[in-house]
Swiss-Prot record:
Localization annotation: Cytoplasm
Protein name: UPF0098 protein YbhB
Tree of life domain: Bacteria
Pfam families for the chain: PBP
Alphabetical list of PANTHER family matching this protein: UNCHARACTERIZED PROTEIN YBCL-RELATED (PTHR30289), UPF0098 PROTEIN YBHB (PTHR30289:SF12)
Subunit structure: Homodimer.
Protein family: Belongs to the UPF0098 family.
Organism: Escherichia coli (strain K12)
SUPFAM superfamilies: PEBP-like
UniProt key word Cytoplasm: yes
An example Gene Ontology CC term for this record: cytoplasm
Record keywords, A-Z: Cytoplasm
Disulfides per UniProt: none
Primary location recorded for the protein, binned into one broad class: cytoplasm
Gene name tied to this protein: ybhB
Length: 158
């Protein structure tokens, strides 16, 4: 499985348009374009996440969680997680560690460089039975048991 983006390059700096607007940052808070291919046989749905493992919480920080993307989905356009693009029926964006749904960009403590890992997971089930209030950890727990494959792009920001 392969993940690509018109907006991100693995190991490069996260562009300003994908940085949080708040907490001392003035980014545009727009979710990036993501596309994937080489999907494994038997894929019934996808989950897309953005996770910061470097957040000073002891458990990282979930910036974006999208569940129940249909098996024929291959692209999330820029702005999908920011309310700029309509979501298909049944697709949910669950609660991030900012306490709300949708995409929220990078906002590390000043002077720290963090990794932002954008991942698509191919699942062997059509849907994860969660609601919008589910945490990234709860979604991740469910993904663990149903993942056929995954692919990631890691962007950096400080």
């Amino acid at each position: 499985m392969k993940l690509i983006s018109n907006d991100l390059r693995d190991g490069d700096k996260l562009p300003h348009r994908h940085v949080f607007n708040g907490m001392g940052y003035d980014g545009d808070n727009i979710s990036p374009h993501l596309a994937w291919d080489d999907v494994p046989a038997g894929t019934k749905s996808f989950v897309v996440t953005c996770y910061d493992p470097d957040a000073p919480t002891g458990s990282g920080w979930w910036h974006w969680v999208v569940v129940n993307l249909p098996a024929d989905t291959r692209v999330l356009p820029q702005g999908f997680g920011s309310g700029l693009v309509a979501m298909p029926d049944g697709v949910l964006q669950t609660r991030t560690d900012f306490g709300k749904t949708g995409y929220d960009g990078a906002a590390p403590p000043k002077g720290e460089t963090h990794r932002y890992i954008f991942t698509v997971h191919a699942l062997d089930i059509e849907r994860i039975d969660v609601d919008e209030g589910a945490s990234g950890a709860m979604v991740g727990f469910n993904v663990h048991f149903h993942s056929l494959a995954s692919a990631s792009i890691t962007a950096m920001f400080s």
